[in-house]
Amino acid sequence: MVKLNELFPKHGSRKAKRRIGLGVGSGLGRSATKGMKGQSSRSGNTKKESKEGGQMPLYRRVPKSGFSNATFAKRFDYVNIGSLEKACKAGEEVTPETMKTLGLVKCAKRVKVLANGELKKGLKVSAHGFSATAKAAIEKAGGSVTVIEKK
């Protein structure tokens, strides 16, 4: 019967690792497959992929194309009416600054109120944007909605 410690891979199925730089007699010594002198033969060699040694690099040969409106996009921080219900008292005036102090938003520059959750308290909410259902839910609970115009 074959024992586990006697198992070995079939001859020729596993290739031996090349141990370079271990003496001239090994056949892979001296320059250790790195060629002669130059940056590539030195230790710690890393050439940038963008460098092509005098040839015009690919990123400069290919023309620029396209345009993205991402830089002009209006980015909002979002607050749900469920979190306003938990954090605010009835009749309270809620502005983006108060939302920031309560920890509901990270940035008070642009805030949009969404309708996830339930609102039973009448709140006076001021924000830069409201979803239609959030606006309806706030007004149904006896609150008011003020849209802040941001340039």
Swiss-Prot record:
It comes from the Bacteria. InterPro entries: Ribosomal_uL15, Ribosomal_uL15/eL18, Ribosomal_uL15/eL18_sf, Ribosomal_uL15_bac-type, Ribosomal_uL15_CS. One of its GO terms (cellular component) is cytosolic large ribosomal subunit. One of its GO terms (molecular function) is rRNA binding. SUPFAM superfamilies: Ribosomal proteins L15p and L18e (SSF52080). Residues 1-62 are annotated as: Disordered. Residues 11-20 have a biased composition (Basic residues). Disulfide bonds: none annotated. Transmembrane segments: none annotated. One of its GO terms (biological process) is translation. Keywords: Ribonucleoprotein, Ribosomal protein, RNA-binding, rRNA-binding. Binds to the 23S rRNA. Belongs to the universal ribosomal protein uL15 family. Part of the 50S ribosomal subunit. PANTHER family: 50S RIBOSOMAL PROTEIN L15, LARGE RIBOSOMAL SUBUNIT PROTEIN UL15M. This is Large ribosomal subunit protein uL15. It comes from Elusimicrobium minutum (strain Pei191). The lineage of its organism: Bacteria, Pseudomonadati, Elusimicrobiota, Elusimicrobia, Elusimicrobiales. The gene is rplO.
